[in-house]
Amino acid sequence: MSTNTVNLNFCLNQAKSHYGGFGYLTIVTLLFSSGSIILLQYLFATDQISIWLHVLLSAYLFYMIYSPLHEAVHGNISGKHQSLKWVNPVVGVISAMFLLYSYTEHKWDHLLHHKYTNDPKLDPDYFVKADNPFSVIVRCVLILFKNVPY
């Protein structure tokens, strides 16, 4: 057996010892981020925080709420518990709702992204690739409209 195969098997065995349990912390992340987003909207709507603080905190919280969506797409929340597989789409739909996105569409796109990572023709996220940070930001906004029928 080659050294690379031995190293790969070692890494796989190490990784297996860390997965399979239920993702309680992912549920906590969902509850904290969604509750905080709702509270933040209330505070802003009642003029208790500035728009700048609102934008800053919202950016962080929307970044945070993507994590449960990502874990749900991969089916990681339920772990090895077959009877809890229903938790993945529930968490995914709730997280996606806050991001004004479809869980089903994101699951499709994200798994295609993993299958075809960095393939210019097949990776759905390749559109974001650009030569400078400004172009990346613009493309990140435009990618939201890539599947809108005209």
Q: At which residue positions do the language-model features occur?
A:
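Structural signature of the GPCR N-terminal helical module
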Residues: 61-73
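Short active-site segment of divalent metal-dependent hydrolases/proteases
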Residues: 73-74, 117
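Post-HEXXH active-site segment of zinc metalloproteases
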Residues: 78-96, 129-130
